[in-house]
């Protein structure tokens, strides 16, 4: 069995299928792990979600910020932007089933036998594996509740929950987890989240900011961390225990697949229309 990890698909379904054909992916024996942001901007978010839903146990994804935003759009809490190319998905006859499936997906997954952890944006350097599991589970529980729209999704958009506080309770605790696992790129030197800078480290001109993965982390010493979200990195991080897989396919660059057992990356250039 092979484990394949794919970067932010964001509706680039044709490129995903090309990659899977190249590696002879077979869901009866292999597993496909996705770093989240299955939807938005690319041309076929609907086919992407349907495909992952159809994989059953052979498909593993985590929620990204665009996936959570889709929940808000479906709940009429936000207005759809034409640039997100989500109208076909939102108007699909099976949208309710797809949304229900999405709500069952976690913010983190792990492959214990390989000591691999996957989230969308990364892991706060202050967190141990036990804390990561615990905080992710709290959000998952909230998403599975019948009142998830009012209790969580309608209130998750906040830049104020930028600092980890283990004594926090309720919504602020959930907000920090969502912000950290789906939006994080840089931290200030005191450890709180920045939500503005999206540039690669070499282009960041704020001396108070450092990429989250440059902070000391016991978890990163013991595990390989697989993440996406930060397209500007283009997969370039100087640490063999970090696998940055967002390489900007929806922006005209590449979709990246990582074969765990071979420690090999395979890329597919964005296909031209027509």
Curated annotation (Swiss-Prot):
The keyword Hydrolase applies. One of its GO terms (biological process) is RNA decapping. Keywords: Hydrolase. One of its GO terms (cellular component) is cytoplasm. It catalyses: P(1),P(4)-bis(5'-adenosyl) tetraphosphate + H2O = 2 ADP + 2 H(+). GO terms for molecular function: bis(5'-nucleosyl)-tetraphosphatase (symmetrical) activity; phosphatase activity. InterPro entries: Ap4A_hydrolase, ApaH, Calcineurin-like_PHP_ApaH, Metallo-depent_PP-like. Its EC number is 3.6.1.41. PANTHER family: BIS(5'-NUCLEOSYL)-TETRAPHOSPHATASE [SYMMETRICAL], METALLOPHOSPHOESTERASE. Belongs to the Ap4A hydrolase family. Hydrolyzes diadenosine 5',5'''-P1,P4-tetraphosphate to yield ADP. NCBIfam families: apaH, PRK00166.1. This is Bis(5'-nucleosyl)-tetraphosphatase, symmetrical. It comes from Shewanella sp. (strain MR-4). The gene is apaH.
């Amino acid at each position: 069995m092979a484990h394949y990890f794919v970067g932010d698909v964001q509706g680039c379904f044709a490129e995903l299928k090309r990659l899977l054909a190249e590696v002879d992916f077979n869901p009866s024996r292999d597993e496909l792990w996705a770093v989240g942001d299955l939807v938005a901007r690319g041309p076929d978010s609907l086919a992407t979600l349907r495909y992952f839903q159809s994989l059953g146990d052979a498909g593993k994804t985590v929620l990204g910020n665009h996936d959570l935003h889709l929940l808000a759009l479906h709940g009429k809490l936000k207005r759809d932007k034409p640039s997100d190319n989500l109208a076909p998905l939102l108007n699909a006859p099976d949208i309710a089933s797809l949304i229900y499936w999405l709500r069952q997906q976690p913010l983190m997954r792990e492959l214990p036998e390989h000591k691999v952890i996957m989230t969308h944006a990364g892991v706060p350097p202050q967190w141990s594996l036990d804390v990561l599991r615990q905080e992710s589970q709290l959000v998952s529980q909230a998403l599975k509740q019948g009142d998830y729209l009012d209790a969580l999704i309608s209130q998750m958009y906040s830049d104020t929950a930028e600092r980890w506080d283990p004594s926090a309770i309720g919504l602020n605790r959930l907000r920090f987890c969502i912000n950290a696992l789906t939006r994080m790129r840089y931290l200030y030197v005191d450890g709180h989240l920045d939500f503005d800078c999206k540039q690669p480290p070499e282009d960041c001109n704020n001396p108070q900011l450092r990429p989250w993965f440059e902070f000391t982390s016991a978890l990163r010493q013991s595990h390989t961390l697989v993440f996406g979200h930060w397209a500007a990195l283009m997969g370039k991080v100087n640490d063999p225990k970090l696998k940055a897989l967002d390489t900007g396919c929806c922006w005209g660059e590449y979709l990246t697949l990582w074969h765990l057992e071979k420690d090999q990356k395979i890329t597919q250039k964005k296909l031209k229309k027509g």
